[in-house]
Amino acid sequence: MAKAKFERTKPHCNIGTIGHVDHGKTSLTAAITKVLAKTGGATYSAYDQIDKAPEERARGITISTAHVEYETADRHYAHVDCPGHADYVKNMITGAAQMDGAILVVSAADGPMPQTREHILLARQVGVPALVVFLNKVDQVDDPELLELVEMEVRELLSSYQFPGDDIPIVKGSALVTLEDGDPSIGEDRVLELMTQVDAYIPQPERPVDRPFLMPIEDVFSISGRGTVVTGRVERGVVNVGDEVEIVGLKDTVKTTVTGVEMFRKLLDRGEAGDNIGALVRGTKREDVERGQVLAKPGSITPHKKFKAEAYILTKEEGGRHTPFFTNYRPQFYFRTTDVTGVVTLPEGTEMVMPGDNVAMDVELIAPIAMDEGLRFAIREGGRTVGAGVVSSITA
């Protein structure tokens, strides 16, 4: 059967299901596609189709992720679901599957469990903007007071990780009942209600082109008679000929003006997110600019050395370290286009970090890098990736 072509007229949003093992993340994913297939907004993906997610390699890390897509009346969604807990950890930290929001699935029969807590913490650390809760398996709970208790517990847990626990929509239903065409009042109707809440509560992400201009510098050339050209792929925003920009990172921030933009050797009047461009910068010497710096809209990003991060450390099988590391570990941190050495401080009570662990840590770099919260990086030793991380907060 030919796949229906999705019309890209609706705003697009990336979401995923998170939560404890066996609480019903994959069943809910299947249930959403089943219900939306009735209105032509999806192709039904059965549980076992989603469950045998293919392995992908992102930044040298093996991650199993299932991708489904569907649309509601208001939006087009790309939805990720991971088979194993480790896959979630890797996915959220590497940003392999970007999440603009997530559906937290909690079994009403069990209440919040350790991975529920860990996924909420990860969502907070990696900057997932909003969560909606699906309280699943309500068909297994006879006592309405028990349901209320579980709901209160989930709200308190969300609040303890700085999510607005009192305001987050919680929809109660059963993914399994939906898949088995059972009672719609806890099945299909609840899945539709969930999607209405997701549409309304998860904010529409800003398109990269609407954000302040930023281009990581990959290379620098000197063109006789014209000046210095920096090249790279525009990460966000737009740059027009004549715009004032800053060169940020590694050294003191310098202001300059873009006097020319070219792409594939053709002159343009602007470059935008996704374009590989060369930008001619006025009055800048070739030796003043280097790979690893960024070209950015003035005042939109600042250079920093110290930050808190959430990181995943590769296993030996993934090509990572064979041994643990301790506080004062000094690897290289690869941001955008370059490596910078940094010193790691582990949190109190964490003696060491084993390959395969994920950890919150403090890092101090030897040179400042243009960064904002949510920036992803690789941890490397001599060019070999041994970990992946995300900046959760900037400390200096």
Curated annotation (Swiss-Prot):
Residues holding Mg(2+): 26
Keyword terms of this UniProt record: Cytoplasm, Elongation factor, GTP-binding, Hydrolase, Magnesium, Metal-binding, Nucleotide-binding, Protein biosynthesis
Top-level EC class as recorded in UniProt: hydrolase
Residues covered by region (G5): 174-176
Any one Gene Ontology molecular-function term assigned to this protein's record: guanosine tetraphosphate binding
Entries under Gene3D superfamilies matching the protein: P-loop containing nucleotide triphosphate hydrolases, Translation factors
GO CC list: cytosol
Known EC number: 3.6.5.3
First-listed, main subcellular location of the protein, grouped into a coarse class: cytoplasm
Region (G1): 19-26
Span list, region G2: 60-64
Compartment annotation: Cytoplasm
Function text: GTP hydrolase that promotes the GTP-dependent binding of aminoacyl-tRNA to the A-site of ribosomes during protein biosynthesis.
PANTHER family: ELONGATION FACTOR TU, MITOCHONDRIAL, ELONGATION FACTOR TU-RELATED
Subunit text: Monomer.
Protein's UniProt name: Elongation factor Tu
High-level lineage: Bacteria, Pseudomonadati, Pseudomonadota, Alphaproteobacteria, Acetobacterales
